[in-house]
Amino acid sequence: MQNNFTLLAGAALAALSVSASAQDLVVKIGHVGPTSGAIAHLGKDNENGARMAVDELNAKGVTIGGKKAKFELLAEDDAADPKQGTAAAQKLVDAKVNGVIGHLNSGTTIPASKIYSDAGVPQISPSATNPKYTRNGYKTAFRVVADDVHWAAPWASTR
């Protein structure tokens, strides 16, 4: 999770539209996953990893352009439901997040990716494997794991 978060933090910083006070920059990172429903344990684990990464970054005292950056995590539950997923995506876009970690499954990731793309918000899915996610042509959509096509070939060759 730390590597995923580091990638997202870098993407968010590259697209930096942070809120600035006199002293600190605030970098808002969104997290969306199922924290309710049948696979809530996976979403909660993922969110906990993101919270740990935010805490570590804030403890390090990261600076951007000579100003101390404060990272904030805005977490939303999509319950692994596409309708809730798009509502969560819009909520994070409206909150002006700098980047998003999520969604956890392809069924919520794909419809949410258009919302993030339209808003110019980088999105990194830690586990969506449907090839459509990164083949839709959205420049803000990134994946951490291989898609189903890449997973299937090596698996099929061992059968």
Language-model-detected regions and their locations in the chain:
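Structural motif
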Residues: 68-94, 151-154
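Extracytoplasmic "Venus flytrap"
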Residues: 30-51, 76-82, 104-107
